[in-house]
Amino acid sequence: MKCLNIVRSVLAAAFMLVVPSAVLAEAPVKTVNFSILATESSTSLQSFWAPIIADMEKQTGYKIKPFYGSNYTALIEAMRFKQTDLGWFSNQSGLEAVRRSGGEVFVRTFDPSGRDGYRSLIIVPAKSNLTLDQVLKCDKSLNFGIGDAKSTSGTLAPMTYLFAPRGIKPAECFKTVRSANHQANLFAVARGVLDVATNNSTAVNLQKDRDSSVNDAIRIIWTSPPLPEDPIIWRKDLDPQVKARLRKFFETYGQGPGPEAARQRALLSKVSIGGFKPADNSHLLPVREMEATEIYLVAKEDGDAAKIAAAQKVLAGIQAERKALAGRTSK
């Protein structure tokens, strides 16, 4: 009997050693939901992002489920309701994700050329004789294409740097105003469907690499000051282990020498990304300043003293933040 008890104890101990690893092996793989900025058609984005997502799955060990929102607001709301865990955002939509959706910037993109920043553009058909002055006449004779309401280069930048300083409201300036993504606006101008539209240097350069005939059919008549690159944002309440794996993937993907890194960079270049650099919410300070500047200019145009004072206070606070940040980073 004593021997039997010993055998049972040994078997029980062996069972306890084996079962946890078996259960662990059979545990379902965690799914991480990743939203992708709607800069062009979802069909195009899916084909370009699929191999990058496959690499993300391999390196993190998670199942990565992509979410292609039809517009920028869809990405913000998806994160707000915890339908997504992280996403590639524009700066303005990313700012909204931080404000409303519990988001947090952890990396940001950089251009394949290695340079930082891109620019908002105003484009017209190449065959058109339109000048910027003629566009700004606001005689309601032109069909205008603008970006998504939460697009930095498609809406915020042209409003802040071009229209608002002149007291121009697009709805009152043009015959029609159509909101669409950069690719749609680029094609609409190239085909003469639109007389003028916003766009950005990234989308134009990307299209040049894919099919330069489209670029030959458009002409740039205005260029903005440099804009910060796009942020990648995750939910602040994500599991720390998930955050650690995601951070490692983004900060190392496409980096370093060798054929594997070169392959990864080639995949990223198809969506005009050179790689990712560490970042935090201070990355959004320039966009907050742009937003506050537009609000101030609109208040000034309307002549509302209370709104002007409030806008000036907000703008001054943001400028002080930027100055303090510049002081810390220069040390």
Report the location of each language-model feature.
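Bacterial N-terminal signal peptides that target proteins for export
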Residues: M1-L11
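A structural signal for short loop-to-beta-strand junctions that line the ligand-binding cleft
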Residues: G103-R115, G145
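Short helices/loops that flank or line small-molecule/ion binding pockets
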Residues: T73-G87, R100, Y118, H182-A197
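Bilobed "Venus flytrap"/periplasmic-binding protein-like clamshell domains
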Residues: V29-E57, G69, Q92, Y118-F187, ...
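Bacterial N-terminal signal peptides
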Residues: S9-P20
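A ligand-binding cleft/hinge motif common to bilobed small-molecule-binding domains
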Residues: W88-S101, A164, A190-R191, D195-N215
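An extracytoplasmic/periplasmic, membrane-proximal ligand-sensing/linker region
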Residues: E40-S41, S47-P51, R245-K331
